[in-house]
Amino acid sequence: MENKINFSPPSTREGKGVRFLLTTFSILLCSLQAVAQSLPRVAPEQVGMDSHRLLHADEAIHRAIDHKEIPGAVLAVIRHGKMAYLKAYGNKRIYPNVEPMEINTVFDMASCSKSMSTAVSVMILVERGQLRLLDRVSFYLPDFQEWRGENGEKKDIRIIDLMTHTSGLPPYAPVSELQEKYGSPNPKGLMEYISTCKREFKPQTKFQYSCLNYITLQHIIETITGQSLRDFAKENIFDILGMQYTDYLPTIQQQDGKWINTVACPWMDRIAPTEKQKDGSVLCGQVHDPLARILKGGISVN
């Protein structure tokens, strides 16, 4: 990660929409507490909405809670820069003790991190001229293999193929097998697997949702910038948009700049747990996805 890669600026067409993406995510992903404090509260009718129709959303959430599909939720409806509806439902925690949901609860973004962090980071690099969407992946990761057909045909996998899930990479990786082979966590070992694993179809011929696409994009971002995706996203997305309660791990930063992973995180008590484990423990502030948690140490984009 020591070396940064610089390229000539891409075409204007490739850079279009980056600011739109950032603006969109700033609207969607700021903490609800911050939004509630900064936006004026109005009746739904004042922004052209129907209070009675909003009750359908209420009913849907209560129904999901009653059917035990979810323990709780937070709903915010914003239109024309005004808060028309904000409500917490059900419980944030149900085991080992019950805690009610609050409007400032922090949720696990899960796979939304693909678009919220990784895709935006890629487009920032496109806008800066450090990356092109039509570049082949192997330009940045030399060990990354192209697709090869049975008749000897070859086709490169491009950045855009990773972003649109048309690369041919398999959906997931064998976590237990890789943990036994490489140890845990081992992002380098995982990337070694992704670089050489069987491509399941010719790029651009099929759509297949794959966590491995975005893990590969993460490594490209880190290769270009010389930073971890966590640090790059914090400096270039989260801090800029005022997303002070958004991070890959609930941590605090020390005066020397180092990050310390700790349950003493100032906003730890606001985090909603995600999953009960076989041993009875409950994951809270840790990603529940095994690939991200076991092989990537929690800093992953899948």
Predicted regions and their residues:
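Short, glycine/proline-biased beta-turn/loop segments that scaffold the active-site neighborhood
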Residues: 133-149, 239-241
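Glycine-biased, low-complexity coil/linker segments
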Residues: 13-15
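Active-site SXXK
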Residues: 55-61, 75, 81-83, 108-134, ...
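Bacterial N-terminal signal peptides
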Residues: 22-33
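Short, surface-exposed loop or secondary-structure junction motifs
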Residues: 149-302
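Short, conserved catalytic-motif segment at the N-terminal edge
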Residues: 42-107, 195-196
